[in-house]
Amino acid sequence: MEQISSLNIPVRGTPMTVDAAMALAINEAYKGGPRVSPNPLVGCVVLDSQGGFVSAGHHEFYGGPHAEVNAVKNLSAEDLKGAHVIVTLEPCAHEGKTPSCAKMLAKLPLKRLTFGLIDPNPLVAGQGAEILRQAGIEADLYQADDLKRDQEMRIRLEEVCEAFLWNFRQKKVFVALKMASSLDGQVALKSGESQWITGAESREYVHYLRACYDGLLVGKGTIEFDNPSLNIRHPQIEKKNKVVVIDGEGDLIGRYTDLKLSNEHDADNVFWCVAEDLKEDVLKKTKKLSKTPQLVFVKTKVGGNLDLEDLLAQLYTLGFRSMLVEGGALTASSFVEVGLVNRLYMFQAPIIMGSAGSKSWTETIRIEEMKNKIFIQHPTYKTFGNDFMITGRIQ
């Protein structure tokens, strides 16, 4: 997920290639990060008949106008005569919370439309493009000038709406894991102390990430040691987030109203996950509380640990489409071990903590042969102050 930024929008009339316009459309799409779920992030750029930049737009919030509408809403028929529209995702053909973008565009005096990805819904895939063709507008799938560039852009186009694509194809929650460690991979002292490993710049970016996912998940250890608020504190974002807590044995539910998060969040926005075998005991504990979070009773595996696949399946049913896991070492490694993490955000600070008195976030993951090592695919890197971050897909 890209950082919120002040994009360098070209001056009107600036010549742009289709590749450059698509790259700008991708960057534009990320502006909607905190507000569009469960819809995909989409960006759109309009070029005039001579290939000069005219305007850009993005899908700003769920239920609001789509990127194509925002890109053309302030343009006249003369501005759009012979224009070329570049958009990251095929214009929608169906009527939903908003009218069909394809039908809207078909009424404009455009010459051409280029879209980055075909609509993933097989029932409507290609229909948006066909509506435009029937109106006499060229509509084609984006292809970069050379093979390497095309592969790179294809990856970027998939990444910009990766949670949406995962939801549609798999009907599962898209899971991202955020970790912060020292150079030697330590995430906390053995006492549990971990504040702070990374700097203020990294932590601000994490609050941006919190806003971009439907929920924030932590384990009970994080609650016990840090008593965190788990809210979003970012200078550019005002948003109430949802929190998921894994407390398999229900140890902390009786103290819920004493926790900071109970004051920071409406009870309906907190989801407390406990073993289904303990349902009766947990319900007894919650009767004594003045307010109660939403309870999620989860199947257990051999050994008593919660079945994380069942947990995610229940969260999907409850409306979650993406989740940022920020839990401690045990929570993080548990999700990685069972192959449930789609994307990793790994922040590292230029410090060394040493393994003798610290904990690694992978200490429960055991790999016997190098051929079984875990790969981070399509990694990208960013710096935040003195820290750096690597992010990529885990396969």
PLM features per residue range, with description:
Residues 17-37, 167:
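Short, basic/aromatic recognition patches
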Residues 41-51, 179-180, 390:
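Short beta-strand scaffold segments in enzyme catalytic cores
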Residues 25, 43, 92, 132, ...:
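Residue-level signal for inorganic ion chemistry
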Residues 46-153, 242, 276, 302, ...:
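Zn2+-dependent cytidine deaminase-like catalytic core
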Residues 277-278, 363-395:
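Conserved histidine-centered catalytic loops in small-molecule metabolism enzymes
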Residues 337-376:
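Flexible, gly/pro- and Lys/Arg-enriched active-site loops
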Residues 166, 170-318, 330-333:
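Active-site ligand-binding patch in enzyme domains
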Residues 120-123, 224, 251-253, 279-280, ...:
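Short gly/pro/ser/thr-enriched loop/turn and capping motifs at secondary-structure boundaries
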